[in-house]
Amino acid sequence: MQTRRKFLLTVAGVAVAVAAPSLVHAAGKLAVSPSQATAITQVLGDGVKLMAVAVAYPYAVSASELNVSDFSVAGRTVSKVFPAKTIGLTPSDSGPYVIVQLAETDANTSLQEDVYEGNPEDAKPQMQGGKPNWVAGQKMKKTIRFNEATASISANGSTLTTSSTHNLIADSFRQAEFSDSKTGKTLKYNFFIPENTQKALPLVLFMHDAGVTSEQTKATLYQGLGAIIWADPAEQAKRPCYVLAPQYDEIIADDDWRTSKYLETTIHLIQKLIREHKIDPKRIYATGQSGGCMTATAMNIKYPNFFAASYLVAGKWSANLVAPMAKNKVWWMASEDDLGAFPSFNAITERLEQQGVKISRAVWNGAWNVDQYRFAYDDLTAERAQMYYTVFEKDSVFRETDSRQGASGHRNTWRIAYSIEPIREWLFSQKKK
């Protein structure tokens, strides 16, 4: 009997069937079947996706033996087939793995699942003014989790089921819990330790949005680029750092400008990590999206000397409360399609300017390429301001397939925001005196 959970996985396109041909050794005499299969997932701007299947063979397969048309994946589009020396998305001329790469544009590839406490109808939040009326510290009856990707692979008349999942970058984070004696809270978190820890390095704190509230420790890693991007090998080669991504199981900030006790617990956790690792206390950076951005703003207000700089994405706060952060280094990012963050950031930056803060502003396009962002960044930062405020112009954060209803403009802001390298550069150029 098919369980509801298995049904959800099936309709979400998680369980896929891969048909592989019989691969023949170069000598043309030995037909062999794959011995093992591994699902490969990757976190993109809109979440973790099943991106490929690595099929292991008992000999080094050469690229000349492979053809895209020889492979098919039920419900998916095969974009590339190539040999590899290790499980991942790095091709090689030959190797013991055949990587069946899948198209990013395929529909229904999300691994996210809603988790309900009791009846799903009872889990709907109370609404006020057309939006959820959440309260800081509140446990949600509807949370999320991310399922493990699986694939059923057919080759030579036999069937293999993936025996493991290789999560690119996300697997390099360690999971732990911190029991805070001062607040009485226990906080789950993900922690990335850089390869070279001989000298003190910066730490980046990323805090997720309310929609990622979950009991699953890794949910914040899988939701988008906010935590993952800093641990990307290419990023670490340029800007090595520690990365802290707490996983909150309750609402951490609300629209009445209250925060959960997790705010203090997170600060206490960072202080603990500084004591235990070679972390530069003058280069602690905060970033967050939506509710995480709100909490980061509240941290800047309550602990104005704690962070070297902050990247605040698609959040809001009361302009009447931001005076204590007037000396801080902040990059604000919102979209004109975000009916909450855009007016709030406008009010906040105007209030800070009244206090003498130099803020440089620009309207950017969410569809720009790497070179366009670089040019716009160079132009804006030439003004050498204390704070920067960039806004994605109307309709520019949406892809052709994106809905424009509800909070889509809000969510699509952070899908793009963390992919802009020059802003990450700016953050790391800041240091407390």
Regions inferred by a protein language model and the residue ranges of each:
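Gly/Ser-rich "nucleophile elbow"/oxyanion-hole loop immediately N-terminal to the catalytic nucleophile
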Residues: 254-289
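Active-site machinery of serine-nucleophile hydrolases
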Residues: 210-264
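Short beta-strand/loop motif that positions the catalytic acidic residue
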Residues: 332-334
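Primarily recognizes the serine-hydrolase "nucleophile elbow" in alpha/beta-hydrolase
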Residues: 282-325
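A domain-start/cap signature at the N-terminus of enzymes
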Residues: 27-52, 75-201
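N-terminal secretory signal peptides and thylakoid transit peptides that target proteins
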Residues: 1-15
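C-terminal catalytic histidine-bearing segment of alpha/beta-hydrolase fold enzymes
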Residues: 336-340, 358-433
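Short beta-strand element of the alpha/beta-hydrolase
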Residues: 200-209
